[in-house]
């Protein structure tokens, strides 16, 4: 296969889209660190008739072949709303995987760059998805660490190829292991109580799934406002919020959700959503809920986990840096201890987001992964 010509083909059929998704699973089938996503969810994300992100974005997908064997994939995404908001002409690359072959990589990125120029774009950057809730960033440190459901894993040769092609650092995300203390840190407890009284806040917990539905829309509204300043973020549309609510709410573990509201009007001021790690369960499921995938996932979801993943933490801008995060973790730390949690995976945090990283000052933490967004002028 070494001397075979590399051919690039645009994905135009559902069968080809399935092959696009499955290539990631095939490439990493022997990796102990890669966490495969659910094939059905990935197909929904990439399908123009199912993902409401296509109301504000357009995309193209390419596969690289040597003979009849797929050796690479890449998506080009133009988020029109993000470009309009920030007056940019950017294209994103994402959903990118490839064998360690310079010709394959060059031709894959060449196809997206050519399409980008045809569309009048000026800068290509990524890996990014359609929204901030898709996978972001290419792993550059931590290749011997188990991945999470919320983040990409890639082989260590990926970033070297990007640099070889003239791509440079745009921004990094850092990931931490946050070791759970046996008790709520004294300062956290004190700050949380002061904040609760000063701003008239209360903590909401859910015992039945139906109780969370009235808050779901408000949680995402708060997410839109709290994430507005973050790299690559685009405000979610009402249809996108509905899409994510229906996708994620059914799989949440209720005791690991904390919502902070104003007592006077029940407005969602902040929230913390975490889950027992599903990494090993997803590896066993191999991309499918059936025949046994859903059993592996349910067992992991309702187990006594040693690891939890912090998926989403958000606080309204006017309440940021005022101690609301302390209220969230004052609630979650006892929950984690009761479940036997040793540490939490922070998942990607922007290196420039000092406020979010400052909240770990009172915890033992370990920086174990770094991922990068690359860019290149076209």
Question: Model-predicted segments: where are they?
Answer:
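TRNA-binding/sensing appendages of the translation machinery
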Residues: 3-44, 113
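Acyltransferase donor/substrate-recognition loop-hinge adjacent to the catalytic core
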Residues: 3-6, 152-230
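A conserved beta-strand-loop-helix scaffold within acyl/acetyltransferase catalytic domains
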Residues: 24-66, 74-84, 205-206, 211-313
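Acyl-donor binding region in acyl/amide transferases
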Residues: 84-166, 285-362
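Short, solvent-exposed loop/turn segments at secondary-structure junctions
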Residues: 130-132, 181, 209, 277-279, ...
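Catalytic core of tubulin tyrosine ligase-like
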Residues: 376
């Amino acid at each position: 296969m070494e001397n075979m010509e590399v051919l690039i083909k645009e994905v135009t059929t559902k069968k080809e889209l399935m092959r696009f998704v499955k290539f990631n699973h095939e490439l990493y089938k022997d990796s102990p660190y890669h966490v495969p996503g659910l094939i059905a969810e990935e197909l929904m994300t990439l399908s123009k008739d199912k993902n409401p992100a296509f109301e504000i974005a357009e995309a193209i997908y390419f596969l690289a072949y040597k003979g009849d064997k797929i050796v690479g994939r890449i998506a080009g995404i133009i988020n029109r709303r993000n470009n309009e908001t920030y007056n940019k002409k950017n294209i994103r690359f994402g959903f990118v995987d490839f064998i360690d072959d310079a010709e394959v990589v060059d031709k894959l990125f060449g196809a997206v760059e050519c399409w980008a120029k045809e569309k009048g774009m000026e800068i290509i950057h990524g890996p990014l998805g359609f929204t901030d809730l898709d996978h972001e960033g290419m792993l550059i440190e931590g290749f011997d660490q188990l991945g999470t459901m919320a983040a990409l894993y890639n082989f260590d040769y990926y970033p070297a190829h990007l640099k070889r092609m003239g791509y440079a650092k745009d921004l990094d995300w850092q990931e931490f292991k946050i070791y759970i203390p046996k008790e709520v840190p004294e300062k956290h407890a004190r700050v949380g109580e002061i904040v609760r009284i000063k701003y008239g806040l209360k903590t909401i917990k859910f015992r039945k799934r139906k109780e969370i539905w009235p808050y779901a829309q408000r949680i995402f509204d708060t997410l839109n406002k709290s994430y507005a300043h973050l790299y690559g973020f685009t405000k979610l549309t009402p249809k996108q919020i509905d899409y994510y609510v229906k996708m994620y709410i059914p799989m949440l573990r209720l005791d690991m959700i904390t919502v902070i509201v104003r007592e006077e009007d029940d407005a969602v001021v902040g929230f913390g959503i975490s889950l027992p790690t599903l990494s090993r369960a997803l590896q066993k499921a191999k991309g499918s809920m059936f025949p046994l995938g859903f059993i592996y996932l349910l067992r992991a979801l309702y187990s006594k986990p040693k690891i939890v993943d912090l998926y989403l933490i958000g606080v309204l801008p006017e309440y940021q840096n005022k101690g609301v995060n302390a209220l969230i973790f004052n609630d979650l730390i006892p929950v984690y201890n009761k479940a036997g949690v040793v540490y939490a995976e922070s998942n990607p945090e922007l290196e420039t987001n000092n406020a979010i990283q400052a909240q770990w000052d009172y915890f033992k933490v370990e920086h174990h992964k770094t991922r990068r967004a690359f860019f290149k002028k076209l």
